[in-house]
Amino acid sequence: MARRPDEEYDYLFKVVLIGDSGVGKSNLLSRFTRNEFCLESKSTIGVEFATRTLQVEGRTVKAQIWDTAGQERYRAITSAYYRGALGALLVYDVTKPTTFENVSRWLKELRDHADSNIVIMLIGNKTDLKHLRAVATEDAQSYAEKEGLSFIETSALEALNVEKAFQTILSEVYRIISKKSISSDQTTANANIKEGQTIDVAATSESNAKKPCCSSS
């Protein structure tokens, strides 16, 4: 939503991180928002979020990133947090095939609960573990194309492509919001003129000219 010029940001975008437990969602969050990485990061309990303000397409955007727990017992809790999300990063671990296989389940849940226009990016994390890779880049790319998702591989440990991933999804969200704003403004303007109504511009201008610029009290 647009903010007044005197506030510190123009837009607030909510983005959710989803995927199985242990795929590195929390470290992607901390790397992007604080440029930190914790080797002994524990599984998120419930829901956490962090923010970062940055420039997107020349506008100041406050990104509110929600880190949702991947454990089954928290699924009912986290489903409520899909509401209001404009973007989603669906993360799997390139060293664990099961986490990639479960992507379709996460995607279905996301599409069931989130806005139909939500921007979704598939992320293959932990590319630094090259010797343990078990999910081919080509397979993930093919799946992403089939489902209409953008795709990127990252390493939160090495800070590889993390910034690019968030910048890409935020830019896409901004483009969609911008189009909606323009469309909304046009709709509002058109709504003020009833179908078939004739407006006498000259009469309106003359009427306005006769009105005093201020009233005395």
Swiss-Prot record:
It is a lipid-anchor. It comes from the Eukaryota. Its main location: membrane. A lipid is attached at C213 (S-palmitoyl cysteine). Signal peptide: none annotated. Expressed in root tips. GTP binds at residues 19-26, 67-71, 125-128, 155-156. GO terms for biological process: cytokinesis by cell plate formation; protein transport. Intracellular vesicle trafficking and protein transport. This is Ras-related protein RABA2a. It comes from Arabidopsis thaliana.
